Regions:
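Conserved GNAT acetyl-CoA-binding A-motif
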Residues: 96-106
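Extreme N-terminal starter segment of soluble prokaryotic enzymes
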Residues: 3-6
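Residue-level recognition of the GNAT/N-acetyltransferase active site
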Residues: 76, 80, 107-109, 134
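Short glycine/proline-centered loop/turn elements that form peptide/ligand docking sites
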Residues: 89, 110-113, 130-135
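Structural motif
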Residues: 20, 99, 119-120
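Conserved active-site tyrosine of GNAT-family acetyltransferases
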Residues: 117, 122, 142
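Conserved catalytic-core motifs of GNAT/GCN5-like acyltransferases
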Residues: 103-105, 123-140
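Acetyl-CoA-dependent GNAT
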Residues: 8-80, 86-95, 145-150
């Protein structure tokens, strides 16, 4: 098994992340959309790479004041079941001590992702009805509180 490092998102990761997006999501981000995040001062994106520089996955988060909103967590099919998604979430949270909370939406039927987020300290806080399309599905809204007393 290859050694995985979590590194800042960079221009050389864009095309591989776009490929992962196409493999994982029914409404994937484009390369242009991902490239715009490189210059977005409100974006916190991290990339998981192996020792050969292959992109294994990524996480993207946007911040507004002291709030974080995870846009996507994705792991390439060839790298799944190795704890990479968990490492990405944990590293993002570790780098977010300046935030009061981080929140995300997850398909209500995505039990593995819900278990991952729960294991990383997220708790369900609501539902967004018909949030997803292709297929239409509710989203479970989950939040991790990073500062005491803000629940």
């Amino acid at each position: 098994m290859s050694e995985i490092s979590i590194v800042p998102f960079a221009a050389e990761h864009v095309s591989a992340i776009a490929e992962i997006e196409r493999a994982c999501f029914s409404d994937p981000w484009t390369e242009d959309g991902l490239r715009e995040e490189l210059d977005n001062s409100c974006a916190r994106f991290l990339t998981a790479v192996d020792e050969n520089g292959a992109v294994a996955g990524y996480i993207g988060c946007h911040t507004v004041l002291d709030e974080g909103y995870i846009a996507n967590v994705a792991v390439a099919p060839a790298f799944r079941r190795r704890g990479i998604g968990r490492r990405l979430v944990q590293e993002l949270l570790a780098q977010s001590a300046d935030l009061a909370f981080v929140t995300l939406e997850v398909r209500a039927s995505n039990a593995p992702a819900i278990a991952l987020y729960t294991g990383c300290g997220f708790a369900p806080v609501g539902t967004r009805r018909k949030f997803y399309s292709h297929p239409t599905e509710d989203a479970l809204l989950m939040t991790a509180h990073l500062k005491e007393g803000l629940q």
